[in-house]
Every structure is written in structure tokens, then in C-alpha cells.
Amino acid sequence: MLLDTQLELAGGINNVTRILAPQGQVVLALKHPPHAPHLPDDVSLQSVLGEWQLSVQRTAEVSDQQLATIGKAISERQKLETLPYQTALDCPYRPLWHISPPQGLLNDPNGFIYHQGEYHLFYQWHPFVCEHKDKYWVHLKSLDLVHWQWQSVALTPSDWFDSHGVFSGHAVSHQQDLWLFYTGNTRLGVDRQRQTMQCAARMNANGEFEKLGPVIRCLPEGVTEHIRDPKVIYTQGKWHMLLGAQTLAHQGRLAVYHSDDLLHWHFDKLYGDELGNYGYMWECPDWFELQGEAFFVFGPQGIASANPHHTIEHQNRIFRATQNAQGEIALLQGWPLDEGFDFYAPQTAQTTDGRRVLCGWMGLPDETQHPSCDQGWIHQLTALRELEWREGKIYQHPLRELDTLRSEPHTLLLSDTVTELKAKSFDVQVTLPWGCQLRLMQNAQYCVTLTLDAENRLLRLDRSATQIRQGDTIRELKLDSPTVELRILADQSSLEIFINQGEHVMTSRIFTPLDATGISLHGASVDAKLYYMAPASAPFNLEVNV
């Protein structure tokens, strides 16, 4: 059957919500059942999980280009449907200088890169509700890594290869072109069978992204449909694509492909056997060099923590790695990148002066119940961080350009007397002795505490006395330093705590009422340096709707 005939039976393109192409079929998902009184014998109409689907056998006359034409029409409609959700809703928890979504759910940062004089950053977005479904990509640009401007909804889940979500990936700046690589996610049938393909898109002269379709259609041997989040790098004279993967034995591994032209890819092998049973899935890989060392960043899922307070299976890790002359990868020692409550899926980019800068998702895959959901949005990205490799350790520092948002410094005496900062966006720097407790974002009922447990040499972050609705409430970090040096970045409903000059970081969402702006120190009296943080440019298409 011709595609035009199927569209006519479906009630026209405006009645089509998705297009699927499973196993020699063309399936059109519909808003409403078709009005045709009788369908031809070779046409199937069924309700799949509440969605009407019109299916026919795909004939030789139906090309990928014809399917792409339908995908473009769906994409244009999807972009129009997001317009009411591009107006940022006012909310006391909304950050002043972090990136947050105007409405809906934000998750992984994607495509973080410098290209032709500008920094580009994308993020995963479901615009309509605070749920993980049918992901879009939002495109932001910046000249200074501080002030980000909304560009567009770059990619939508409109095509047969990404109908249920434009999943995470990275960007490549090659010659004059900006390429995006991502995982296309589709779900088929009543059992929602997952189908995964690695896809590409390229920016045109108008700044719009044109999908090139799947560049890897089939799974490598020994891997489930859980293979995603392409990172593309150029080493040893060829392109390499790194993918987080799950083996048939349900072990996380790194899958690597190579290519000469970014379009035709060949599978190399799976890496990571030296780590043994290190989680049931790896996702969101990144790879970079720092001070002459190679590093692999990923999100292992299913690693149990020895600490009873840590119950979340979604972890973050960075491993020192090597790649030999044959391109084979070995993973050496590894560490957590962040030891707070809310940090996942980081990506890095290199600045024009050679710094390696990281941005992560300040959230976790299973968290969808934050207080900001009452105002129609959830999650934000982390502050950008500079990475340093020094004396066998990774150090993280707040991006130096963020200092342009700081006020003049104020000296603050921290004691058991509560000082009202009258603001929740600030930068506090202090060195504390063991045996004291710092309270932040405090009023008579709520606060978050940092306890320096002298007996056990533990730094304990406790958010149980906040408005948090979901997730762990205690994190503990073992330290051996004689004192604890802290730099704390706060932004309305988040804390990023840089410990001992960035040797450790704890990133967390902290929800307390708008009037909870007190700070106090119990068990010691110490001078601190305080800076108030000014707002950055709002990263939204439309002004905040109060």
C-alpha cells in the first residue's frame, strides 16, 4: 500500500501522532480512530495501550525519505504544541543562575560543546508534565558559559526511529558543521518492546537541526536493547563512538564503534570486563583528556553502597583510563564525581583556553516528586565546574566566570546566633573545625545541616528537616583532613558543596520555604566570607509568567 493511501485512511496527517516501522510494517498512531467505514483487508486497526494504531505491510515503494516527510510534519506540530510550555512559571524554588526548564521535566545535559565562537548546550525535556516520557532536546547558546539564551526545541520525538524519545547524546564540531548524535527510542506493541537505534542530526544554515536518521540500526552481539547515549570522539585517526550498554548477562559495559565519516559505523568490542559485576547497566558515557591522562565518565546503575543511608542505585563514576595503539581501552582506578543526593549524567566540554568544564543533571532518574512540581516544573542543571587532575586526584572548582555574578565580599561571623541572609542565592567560603554543625536555609521549622563528626571523621549532610518529598535524606563522607574547607554555592533550592578545595563535591536539591534564609554554626565560632549571587540571563524563550 502507498503511504499516501495509508495517510488518507488514517484521517490525514493532523490525526497522526507517531510513526513506527517495526519488522516490515508501517504503523501510524492516531489521535482518534479513523472515520472510514470499512478498512481494506491488508490494513489492521487496533488500540494499543489506549493509542489507536493503523498498520500495513511496508512495501518497496515506501522509502525512508517518505517516512521522514511524515516525521517532519509531526515535528513541526510538536514544536507548536510546546509553545505554551516555553513560558517559565514563577516559583520560589526556581534558581537565579542555574539552568532550569520553563515547565515540565528537565533531565540530562546533552551536546555540550564549543562551535564557531559559541558554546552550545542542550538538555532533555518533557514539556507537558513532570514525568519521564517522550523526550525532546532544548538548545541553548552562550558566549561566556554564564548567560545562556534559549535557541529552539532542537529535536522532537517525531520519527519512526525516535517516536518515544530523543534520548541522550553528544555533539561534534567538524569542519563547519555541528553534528548531534543521540539514541532514538521506540516502544512497540502492547508489551512496549524497546527498540534502540543510534541516530544523527546536523545543523543547517538557519540554525535548525535536520535529522539524518539512524547511523547504527542493529544491536552488537551480546547486548540488550539497553545501549544508548553516544559520545563521539576523534582519536588515532578515526572517529570513535562510545555507548553505555547492558550485556545479555545484565552487566554494564562500554560499547565502542569506529567510523571514517561519522555516518558509517563498525563495531569494535565491549570494554569493562576488568571491573567485573559493576552494575547492571552503564549509561551517559563521556571521555576526555586532562593533564595528559584519559578519563572515562559514566553512570553505573545497580551498585550497592556500603552506607545504609545511601539507597539510590543510580551512581556516578569517573575512571582513569588508557587507550593503546590498537585503540583498546583499559579502565584503571575510579571514584565518585559527586557524593551528594542529586547528580547524574554529566558531560564535559573544552573551553577556548583549554579548560575542561563539566555540567551535570541535578537530579536522578527516579525522582519526580519535588515541591516544584506544584508549580509545573522539576529539576535543573548543576553549576558548571572546572576539572583539574593533580597529585593523583580529580579536583572540581566552580567555573571562574561565575565570579562575575558575585557581590562584593562580606565578612560573616558564624555562631549559634542565627544570621538572616535575606537571600537564598549566595557563595559562602569557610574553614570549619571538627565537632561543629553548620545550618543553612534555616527558619524556625526547616533547615539543612552539615555536621562535622569529630569521633568518626565524617562530614554528614542531612536534609531530613526540609520539604523534600522523595529520595535519601543523609549523605556521609569520610575525610582525614585536620579541618574542613568549604565553598558552598546556594541557589534558591540547591546546594553545591565543594570540600577541601574541590577534592570532593556534594550536590543536592534543598527545598525550604522562601523565608528560610538563616545561617548558624553550633559548636564553634568562625569567620566566613559571603558573596550574594546576582541572576544570570534567564534561559527561557519567553518571560517568566508570575
Swiss-Prot record:
Residues at the active site: D108
One of the Pfam families matching this protein, by short name: Glyco_hydro_32N
Record has Cytoplasm as a keyword: yes
EC number: 3.2.1.26
The UniProt record lists the keyword Cytoplasm: yes
Protein name: Probable sucrose-6-phosphate hydrolase
UniProt family annotation: Belongs to the glycosyl hydrolase 32 family.
Biochemical pathway: Glycan biosynthesis; sucrose metabolism
Purpose: Enables the bacterium to metabolize sucrose as a sole carbon source.
Keywords recorded for this protein, A-Z: Cytoplasm, Glycosidase, Hydrolase
Top-level taxon in the UniProt lineage: Bacteria
An annotated GO cellular component: cytoplasm
MF terms in GO: beta-fructofuranosidase activity
UniProt catalytic activity: Hydrolysis of terminal non-reducing beta-D-fructofuranoside residues in beta-D-fructofuranosides
Native source species: Vibrio cholerae
InterPro entries found in the cross-reference section: ConA-like_dom_sf, GH32_Enzymes, Glyco_hydro_32, Glyco_hydro_32_AS, Glyco_hydro_32_C, Glyco_hydro_32_N, Glyco_hydro_beta-prop_sf, Suc6P_hydrolase
Intracellular or extracellular location(s): Cytoplasm
GO biological process terms held by the UniProt record: sucrose metabolic process
Location, primary (coarse class): cytoplasm
Entries under PROSITE patterns matching the protein: GLYCOSYL_HYDROL_F32
